[in-house]
Amino acid sequence: MCGVSIRRQGGHLFVRRTVAGIGVVAMIVGMPSMATEAQAAQKSCESAGLSSSIESSGQQYALISDVRINYGDEAEPEEYSSLAYAKVMGSGWNLGNSFDSVGTDLSEPDQGEVSWGNPQVTKELIRSVKSKGFTSIRIPMTAYRRYTEVVDAATGTTKTVLDEQWLERYREVVDWAVDEGLHVMIDIHHDSWLWAKNWNGDTNAAEYIRFSDLWKQMASYFADEPELVSFETLNEPQFSQGDAQEKLNALNKAAYDIIRATPGNEQRMIVIPTVETAYGDDRLKATRDFIQKDLHNDPYVMATVHYYSEWVYSANLGITGFDEDLYGGSQPYNPRNSMENFFQRVNAVFTTSGIGTVIGEYGLLAYDSASDNALQAGEEQKYYEYMGHMAREHGIAAMFWDNGSGIDRNDADYSWKKPLAGDVIQASTTGRSSYATGLDTVYIENRPDADISIPLALNGNSFIGIDGLTEGGEYTYDSQQSAVVLKADYLASVFDARKGNGLLADLTLRFSAGAPWHEYVMKSGVPTVDADRLAAGTRENGLDIALDFAGNEFKSITTYQNGNKVGPNSGWWKYLQNGSAVVVHDNTADHSLGSVTLTPSFFADATVQDGQITLEITFQSGKILELTVEISNGVARVQTTI
């Protein structure tokens, strides 16, 4: 086991690395990554031999050497502010659903870090995170079921004590990340909704005392960690009743005071969440005011929010395009605009006030949907690409939420489960990627007799070429319009080579920097119900509707009864949620045979009555399939295809 201790005192940085089990404490020379160029230019190093030793747990350790790194005579608080810290945290990754996972069935034993199905965390996984270009990692931790309540017989007071073995294992993984040079954010995670939300505001209440006890132990246990390690007080704080902001301020102040009073944490970076880590102006401003007034504008305090984009796009309620209008208002507003608005808000409230920000979680909610391709692949990649760009532009740290559906933790190589999305996420840690301004698929119904132009968003890069094709042959490149032009003869040749509907070509477009872009050429026909595979369903179990997608990718579905929209959210929205009220199975590159399933949650909605329901299914190609479902006495059947 090894640990690194870094201390900053009087303009000096002291670095110590401890290697246990071999009888030696080895000292290393190093500089934390937050050092500015000016600091680096002023640094000087000194080494002095030590002829002493220490004993810990009955084992002797020889002190080989000590190191001093001098940045100069000036103190660094302004240079080492939370703004600078956020910049060097940069692009991060969440070790989600591991140490934060917990079984809530108290009749079953706690399974620890594997409670929600992810395998035990390995050092190789942490190394792979670093190798993928991430510079920070968030390691969420749920304390619930990992502590005991100890009652003092004399006073009758109760003290919460975290399990020592649990803490040791948690710290082991934290130290693996530190050893890789990653900035590490630790926190108290699902406790926010498991018990902390029930706090009534009384500082004598069990929730407040428990929260304080947890941070007393955490602050002490991790006090000798280097400044790479930051403390996030509470994940997504929420409260069942009362003034949520007032309660959160009280908990944040309690954690802050405990951390600062614990030796070794005088300049520890403390991360303060907004209520529910939301980013409405009221939430942002309340947190800014708390940091400025209650925490006296401590330069070693950051703010944190989470960003999952607009729900109707993120969770796929029929809006699948990153540049697709969301709400149909007089002024178009799309997910790209939403992201820009988010960063503008954070910048205006936190950054301009000198407060650094970390987006502790970002992603799209349908990433691990029950539906195949619930997120349109190319449009999902555009979201990640722009997220990385905007975070870098604003000097804000951004940490991708991965609950196990991102990096494959059961794969020896720790590859991405969605390789193309992973490529873009990795590329976005350092720069921009290029892509088609439109959809990642060209749909062709009839034999082409004209060229097809694919406009590109280069984002500062240069177009290099298409794998396996020759510029001037199968395609040309219009540099003035930044567009690839697929020649009619080439399109006709691949069209003729395929008898049925499906994928004609997977074109890999490469650029001077960033991830490659895949543009698919698809032969598409008319989607139909596959009568041979139809079967009746029920309200209780749902209805599977077998389809021949005919080379078309599903986009959205609207359901009507007696001329009115029905189904979950139909009172305010026009489409069903893909992965919830409807589940789509179409996992082939050809978009051939598959199914659309109306789930039990659809039939359970009060708006869905017995009788005929019309389904309007829209595909990315623009084609629409209408069919009728008859519901009677709990049984549902497909009746008509138009």
Which sequence ranges carry the predicted segments?
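Aromatic-rich peripheral "rim/lid" segments of glycoside hydrolase catalytic domains that contact
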Residues: 369-467, 485, 500-518, 526-535, ...
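Active-site region of glycoside hydrolase catalytic domains
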Residues: 66, 209-333, 344-364, 393-394
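Sec-dependent N-terminal signal peptides
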Residues: 13-31
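Sec-dependent signal peptide cleavage junction
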Residues: 29-47
